[in-house]
Curated annotation (Swiss-Prot):
Residues 619-628 have a biased composition (Polar residues). Induction: By high-cholesterol diet. Interacts (via YLYF motif) with INSIG1 and INSIG2. The lineage of its organism: Eukaryota, Metazoa, Chordata, Craniata, Vertebrata. It catalyses: S-ubiquitinyl-[E2 ubiquitin-conjugating enzyme]-L-cysteine + [acceptor protein]-L-lysine = [E2 ubiquitin-conjugating enzyme]-L-cysteine + N(6)-ubiquitinyl-[acceptor protein]-L-lysine. A motif (YLYF motif) lies at residues 81-84. This is RING finger protein 145. GO terms for cellular component: endoplasmic reticulum membrane. It is a multi-pass membrane protein. The chain crosses the membrane at residues 53-73, 77-97, 123-143, 146-166, 168-188, 205-222, 225-245, 275-295, 316-336, 340-360, 384-404, 410-430, 460-480, 482-502. Keywords: Endoplasmic reticulum, Membrane, Metal-binding, Transferase, Transmembrane, Transmembrane helix, Ubl conjugation pathway, Zinc, Zinc-finger. The active site is at C537. Residues 587-663 are annotated as: Disordered. It is found in: Endoplasmic reticulum membrane.
Length: 663
């Protein structure tokens, strides 16, 4: 059953490719120039070419037929192709019969065939060919009435009966007319089939639109036609034909530089129409998806394909190529200029793929560094991929500077490549810190601050580079050629890569500064209080040799509570808000009210405390979230069962503000 479904899926794509190729040919065909050539040739007196408007209408009819063939259901499409194959077989039978009659006329032998070996060979060959044609037609049309397709065997039967050659010519014409009448009868009996199909399709479309809407109809057609795979196969067929036509006319092998130029020019030739450009877009998307999938497989093996929600990657690269092609008018350029521009666009796509590879590798590498996994092979794969992502973007930027004149798009490529290398450098630095901490007996103090400073340095460099790109783009727009699309790209780049990043970075800095001030304002627990409390930190589940006390009388490690406050300003246990006393109205400089001496030291909550890295603070990025992982907080975790002991004392309602005295 699976094999049948796969075969149907292959047929669903393969049978629709010719319709897109026909659309592509009709787009390339210039009817006006075609008729100008006809007027200058000897075909001008042909009645078929006297009616130009009829040919123009036939041009549009070709578009309609192509769209109909593209959207036909698979069952009807298969049936249509079977009818077409049957027509080809009948034409082949007609050709076999005509060639046989012509050969007999040239030989002028009218005697018994068994007395003439050449005549016998011709008869045997023609008979076998006609039998094969009749059998295939019967199988394709699924009928046992084989005589319907055997009219072209009449000249063979007449020759076997020693009929004169002049009469055999007449019999051959009769067989041709009989077969033509059969075809006309079949077409006439199915004349209303297209109308009925269109009527039923219209009724079904109206029902779907009324019930589900136009968006659901579009998604259904997209999935049924398998549009991405269909256009990718169409473009690959065009590209293969282009390569074949080149090598079939060349006798000498091409050099390496010539092969690279051939590759670019072939791609440029295969994106000269909107249909072929869409094919290139989907092909690039699938190539990017394949590269990113191989990247995950290299890092994680078969575990990469288990519950992977990000298998829709690759569309970013395809959309990028489409936007750049439309913005630069790619399909309107000459082949050489198109190949040059396409090389720049492909560089941008490669830079985007490298950035996506880094997005995949970054959390995996950091998680591997923070874990206790001793597998050298896993560490080798992670580090080798990071080294590749460190060296290759820098090499690509160097080659671009060597061979191209600098402009706005090349600056975007170079800046993206440099930022990718810098981000990989930061990832490797944090990975080395994790590995150093792994071999130490005690955790490294202020590790989260080091990670934050590393990420902050990278984010600052990224912000500066984005700002430089915007400044260069604005200057080029003002003093160079101004376009609406270019201005929109600069505006979008400024909003997402400059303004939003600046906001997130500043917000992250304020959160960390506020968390540090709050920790400094909390009292430090004495040794007597720790012995009396006799509990573990409710965040990292480790024994407390030093701790700070919240206004709600909860004990935490200062570092653990600081990480928690990076995310939210509530107590991890009772969830009351921790604010400075100066921020609360009516409190003035009075000391904050403290619970009674016998108040509970820990409160059993219905919800367990969330880890401090449960929600990544804005602007810190993936690396900081990985650095603040539970492996860093807890390097030999105790049992979670002792996280909180039930105690007696007043409950603090959730959401109540707990003032924190200013230091």
């Amino acid at each position: 059953m699976a094999a049948k479904e796969k075969l149907e899926a292959v047929l669903n794509v393969a049978l629709r490719v010719p319709s897109i190729m026909l659309l592509d040919v009709l787009y390339r065909w210039d009817v006006s120039s075609f008729f100008q050539q006809i007027q200058r040739s000897s075909l001008n007196n042909n009645p078929l070419f006297q009616y130009k408007y009829l040919a123009l209408n036939m041009h549009y009819v070709g578009y309609i037929l192509s769209v109909v063939l593209l959207t036909l259901p698979r069952q009807h499409l298969v049936q249509l192709y079977l009818y077409f194959v049957t027509a080809l077989l009948l034409y082949a039978g007609h050709q076999i019969s005509r060639d046989y009659v012509r050969s007999e006329l040239e030989s002028a032998y009218e005697g018994p065939m068994y007395l003439e070996p050449l005549s016998m060979n011709r008869f045997t060959t023609a008979l076998i060919g006609q039998l094969v044609v009749c059998t295939l037609c019967s199988c394709v049309m699924k009928t046992k009435q084989i005589w319907l397709f055997s009219a072209h065997m009449l000249p063979l039967l007449a020759r076997l009966c020693l009929v004169p050659l002049e009469t055999i010519v007449i019999i051959n014409k009769f067989a041709m007319i009989f077969t033509g009448l059969e075809v006309l009868y079949f077409l006439g009996s199915n004349l209303l089939v297209p109308y009925n199909l269109a009527k039923s399709a219209y009724r079904e479309l109206v029902q779907v639109v009324e019930v589900y809407g136009l968006l659901a109809l579009g998604m259904s057609l997209w999935n049924q036609l398998v549009v991405p795979v269909l256009f990718m196969v169409f473009w690959l067929v065009l590209f293969a034909l282009q390569i074949y036509s080149y090598f079939s006319t060349r006798d000498q092998p091409a050099s390496r530089e010539r092969l690279l130029f051939l590759f670019l020019t072939s791609i440029a030739e295969c994106c000269s129409t909107p249909y072929s450009l869409l094919g290139l877009v989907f092909t690039v998307s699938f190539v990017a998806l394949g590269v990113l999938t191989l990247c995950k497989f290299y890092l994680q093996g078969y575990r990469a394909f288990m519950n992977d929600p990000a298998m829709n990657r690759g569309m970013t690269e395809g959309v990028t190529l489409l936007i750049l092609a439309v913005q630069t008018g790619l399909i309107e350029l000459q082949v050489v200029h198109r190949a040059f521009l396409l090389s720049i666009i492909l560089f941008i796509v490669v830079a985007s793929i490298l950035q996506s590879m880094l997005e995949i590798a970054d959390p995996i590498v950091l998680a591997l560094g923070a874990s206790r996994d001793k597998s050298l092979w896993k560490h080798f794969r992670a580090v080798s991929l990071c080294l590749f992502l460190l060296v290759f973007p820098a090499y690509m930027a160097y080659m671009i500077c060597q061979f191209f004149h600098m402009d706005f798009w090349l600056l975007i490529i170079i800046s993206s490549s440099i930022l990718t290398s810098l981000q990989v450098l930061g990832t490797l630095f944090i990975y080395v810190l994790f590995m150093v901490e792994e071999f130490r007996k005690e955790p490294v103090e202020n590790m989260d601050d080091v990670i934050y400073y590393v990420n902050g340095t990278y984010r600052l460099l990224e912000f500066v580079v984005a700002l430089c790109v915007v400044a260069y783009g604005v200057s080029e727009t003002i003093f160079g050629e101004w376009t609406v699309m270019g201005s929109m790209i600069i505006f979008i780049h400024s909003y997402y890569n400059v303004w939003l990043r600046a906001q997130l970075g500043w917000k992250s800095f304020l959160l960390r500064r506020d968390a540090v001030n709050k920790i400094k304002s909390l009292p430090v627990a004495t040794q007597e209080q720790l012995e009396k409390h006799n509990d573990i930190c409710a965040i990292c589940y480790q024994d407390m040799k030093s701790a700070v006390i919240t206004p709600c009388s909860h004990f935490f490690h200062a570092g653990c509570l600081k990480k928690w406050l990076y995310v939210q300003d509530t107590c991890p246990l009772c969830h009351c808000h921790l604010k400075n006393s100066s921020q609360l109205p009516g409190l003035g400089t009075e000391a904050a009210p403290q619970p009674p001496a016998g108040a509970e030291q820990n409160i059993v909550l219905q919800e367990g405390p969330e880890p401090p890295d449960h929600e990544s603070p804005p602007g810190t990025g993936t690396q900081e979230g990985s650095g603040d992982s539970s492996e860093h907080i807890n390097r030999g975790s105790a049992s979670q069962e002792g996280a909180a002991d039930a105690g007696e004392g007043p409950q603090i309602p959730e959401g109540e503000v707990c003032p924190v005295e200013s230091a």
